[in-house]
């Protein structure tokens, strides 16, 4: 059977081979669909590779709706589940360029600005462990099947020689792990001190190595953390590139305090992440969960044994989106991009980035759909939602659409199966008759072997079990090899860019020489011009304009850095501390949630009589005290800076609050500062500013722009202005959901307090 993939095209009709190679290497978004608007895909079950046919883009689209009605609906409803392009059946296949556009409208989606934090991305290990415990206890209360690792009734008694050998191996791998972790941590720290931005993978590796060091040597908390705080002013002097060089303060004291606040805030957030990595440890001896997972993974990949559905669902949760995407092969990444109708040409890093953004958008939409209810969706909305999730959307009944969308929401939101696994099962075109567990089993069979070690560590951490040093060592070395490979790819890309620029300069010089030679021939050819005019006066000429595809303006990595510097400079000119205060409040919320999660874990464990078996690690307790002290010091720094600002502005009343819209700047202000930093064409600056101005009122929130830039800046890729606008919409949805979840948690806590009283 065949599969037909109709994707949107923004490319010109003709391209040179050099431009095609350049776009393939850089992964430009000129050919890709945006994150929320996708084209129509007609797919049937096929074990083959995804194929595709490219149709002309929206330059030839005709809207059948009344334009004024369409604009009114767009203004009051910012969220689209999809825009479906249906080719006109009256036209032949090769000439279909007129489409009927059907819009699927949501309900009650108010517009507001973007505010996002790192907590929107994923849950911490403590939260995932708590969720696992709650699910297990709930199933025990309901009498359902609960998977638990098997424990040998009579453990094999080891000889003295075997015990000595095992202890020697344990300490050998432990010391080797400590040495490698220390080496990696020092190297990453040196990169940070010298102003280099760690990639997403490098930061995860840095966090893991620091957690391992504190876990192996808990007493280092008393040495390293106070030492780092004490030497912070010295580090800022010796390594000025740690922070952007755009500080323009009125006093040296204010500059010093702001730099110290910025670095302390980043350090405290990193330490809080480390705390959650090493939070709990299990003192009781239980079944080896890592061996259970290894047996399960071997069952589904090698042997013909079929694991239970409970095992499949339980272990599928370990393959989180970032873990899965970071280890997928290129053909699998390309297949996912084609399934989601994204740009499938580009580097692996670029493909992963757009997939991560798309998965986050799907996750936000899933929560909004679950809140509104699947039954409230129209047929067009159901088709759009199913197609975006890689499910069959045409040729099926409305009841079938609702059923498969409900099944998706059940697996994703209730069973907590990662979106990447659900999409991979759709990308392989498995039969609809297969159960969800069988689909997940087949998907796990096709995952790379390299993911097994990483998932093996995760399953032990979520179960509070100890992971042996050898497994951790293998995982660390495996991740280090992947980081080196990514760095090699980036270096090759930079070299290719440099070679291309040199080639363009050579071609421009040759063109100048040819132009000079051409001027010499002008006089000789001028004598023959009258004859040429007479000959060609009757020649027919085509005066129609040359059609070119609509292409979004590309923003390079250097321009993203420049935009970040411009926002920092504007913040310093306005003496704004709103972002720092917001991040500090988020950090306080993280610390409070961490404490509440620990208390909940103890209550859940007490239901099974295991509250004494699990305790908070010593390193985690010591780091928590240090983070609380740092929060107190940062509060004092912010208070001191605000007092200085009041004195400078003549506002002596301590109760004065910042006016509404203090963070807003005009587009012209942003463009002016960007011009001062780097010489960029006017049309490029206008396109960047227009992408950031979502509501088109000429005003931009500095903190919102910084958050978007920080998200993009972690990836070494070029990005289009259209994609920047889509990221802002995605972050807006996530913030809306976060506020609703906070309000819901607050109501639940108040109700629980009333019940206790």
UniProtKB/Swiss-Prot annotation:
It is found in: Mitochondrion inner membrane. One of its GO terms (cellular component) is mitochondrial inner membrane. Residues 476-521, 554-618, 722-755 form a coiled coil. Residues 259-552 form the Letm1 RBD domain. It is a single-pass membrane protein. The chain crosses the membrane at residues 216-236. Ca(2+) binds at residues 693, 695, 697, 699, 704. Gene3D superfamilies: EF-hand. SUPFAM superfamilies: EF-hand. Residues 237-757 are mitochondrial matrix. Residues 114-215 are mitochondrial intermembrane. Keywords: Antiport, Calcium, Calcium transport, Coiled coil, Ion transport, Membrane, Metal-binding, Mitochondrion, Mitochondrion inner membrane, Potassium, Potassium transport, Transit peptide, Transmembrane, Transmembrane helix, Transport. Residues 680-715 form the EF-hand domain. GO terms for biological process: calcium export from the mitochondrion; calcium ion transport; inner mitochondrial membrane organization; mitochondrial calcium ion homeostasis; mitochondrial calcium ion transmembrane transport; mitochondrion organization; potassium ion transport; protein hexamerization. GO terms for molecular function: calcium ion binding; calcium:proton antiporter activity; ribosome binding. Residues 1-113 form a transit peptide. InterPro entries: EF-hand-dom_pair, EF_Hand_1_Ca_BS, EF_hand_dom, LETM1-like_RBD, LETM1/MDM38-like. The keyword Lyase does not apply. It catalyses: Ca(2+)(in) + 2 H(+)(out) = Ca(2+)(out) + 2 H(+)(in); K(+)(in) + H(+)(out) = K(+)(out) + H(+)(in). PROSITE patterns: EF_HAND_1 (PS00018), EF_HAND_2 (PS50222), LETM1_RBD (PS51758). It comes from the Eukaryota. Homohexamer. Plays an important role in maintenance of mitochondrial morphology and in mediating either calcium or potassium/proton antiport. Mediates proton-dependent calcium efflux from mitochondrion. Also functions as an electroneutral mitochondrial proton/potassium exchanger. Required for the maintenance of the tubular shape and cristae organization. Belongs to the LETM1 family. This is Mitochondrial proton/calcium exchanger protein. It comes from Danio rerio (Zebrafish). The gene is letm1.
